[in-house]
């Protein structure tokens, strides 16, 4: 029996302006080389741009975008008897949100545009409207999981 104690989950702090944990998760994923102030600047500029474009609350747009991109299932490679199967696995909401944020940021980096703030804002607006690269990634993952549903018993 293990003698290790149960590790407590770290609580995610909220950001200074919106006082929201999702915002802090997003900023931490934008972060590069420890430059958190730059990550905050990029994110807040993106939120300002969303407010100008949509005339709506940017925080609700962010929530809606993350909700629409969050996957229910993902696929894991599992090796059984010399062959590798793509096994569909249900994921928890926290992990789904983390994946959604990753996909949103990756899709916004691929976009053509002036700077990261503009690209991020347009990707968030598109995701809130159920279009864009991040939504396509979610649908592709769900399609793969559906196609490999026969291997679900390998979990």
Curated annotation (Swiss-Prot):
GO terms for molecular function, please?
A: mRNA binding; rRNA binding; structural constituent of ribosome
Q: Name one GO biological process term.
A: ribosomal small subunit assembly
- UniProt keyword rRNA-binding, yes or no: yes
Q: Write out the annotated subcellular location.
A: Plastid, Chloroplast
Keywords for this protein: Chloroplast, Plastid, Ribonucleoprotein, Ribosomal protein, RNA-binding, rRNA-binding
Q: Which GO terms describe its cellular component?
A: chloroplast; ribosome; small ribosomal subunit
InterPro entries, per the entry? Ribosomal_uS7, Ribosomal_uS7_bac/org-type, Ribosomal_uS7_CS, Ribosomal_uS7_dom, Ribosomal_uS7_dom_sf
In terms of one coarse class, where is the protein primarily found? Answer: plastid
Q: Which domain of life is it from?
A: Eukaryota
Q: Which Pfam families match?
A: Ribosomal_S7
NCBIfam families referenced in this protein's UniProt entry, alphabetically: rpsG_bact
Q: Which HAMAP family match?
A: Ribosomal_uS7_B (MF_00480_B)
Oligomeric state and interaction partners are given as: Part of the 30S ribosomal subunit.
Q: Which family does it belong to?
A: Belongs to the universal ribosomal protein uS7 family.
* Role description: One of the primary rRNA binding proteins, it binds directly to 16S rRNA where it nucleates assembly of the head domain of the 30S subunit.
Q: Provide the protein name.
A: Small ribosomal subunit protein uS7c
UniProt organism field:
Physcomitrium patens (Spreading-leaved earth moss)
The organism's taxonomic lineage, starting at the top: Eukaryota, Viridiplantae, Streptophyta, Embryophyta, Bryophyta
Q: Which gene encodes it?
A: rps7
């Amino acid at each position: 029996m293990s003698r290790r104690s149960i590790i407590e989950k770290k609580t995610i702090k909220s950001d200074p302006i919106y006082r929201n944990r999702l915002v802090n998760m997003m900023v931490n994923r934008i972060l590069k080389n420890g430059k958190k102030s730059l990550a905050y600047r990029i994110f807040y500029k993106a939120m300002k741009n969303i407010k100008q474009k949509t005339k709506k609350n940017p925080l609700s747009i962010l929530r809606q975008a993350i909700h629409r991109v969050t996957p229910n299932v993902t696929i894991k490679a599992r090796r059984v008897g010399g062959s590798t199967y793509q096994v569909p696995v249900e994921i928890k909401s926290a992990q789904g949100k983390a994946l959604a944020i990753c996909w949103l940021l990756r899709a916004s980096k691929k976009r053509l545009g002036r700077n990261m703030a503009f690209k991020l804002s347009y990707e968030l607006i598109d995701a809130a409207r159920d279009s864009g690269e991040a939504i396509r990634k979610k649908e592709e993952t769900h399609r793969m999981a559906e196609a490999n549903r026969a291997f679900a018993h390998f979990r």
